[in-house]
């Protein structure tokens, strides 16, 4: 059996909505029993995170699904996503938090990428599966 050499030649990302500062977090995630978190400032000081991106409105309404965000990141790989997707032969996606269990996460991402045609899909499942090897 011969193995083909595979290289990562491009990366992309997608971040939903505007960045949310530490002071705004609870406006999106809510309070604990109607009160601000007692340990929030300590945790945030120690983890060093200054802002994050939520796929939520301030009222807690979802703005993007996990599979939609993955597909938008994939589209970011190409100047012309419709044309570039025609060359994709394999879509493999790993997540610990899929939108649902069936169909698989990779199948749902594939559904958001109609120009990828008959690309194969692989969807490893489980905790910390971003490091899964097949």
Where are these regions (language model features)?
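Conserved "HGTGT" condensation-loop signature of ketosynthase/thiolase-family condensing enzymes
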Residues: 1-90, 111-114
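Conserved catalytic cysteine-centered active-site region
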Residues: 40, 46-54, 64, 96-134
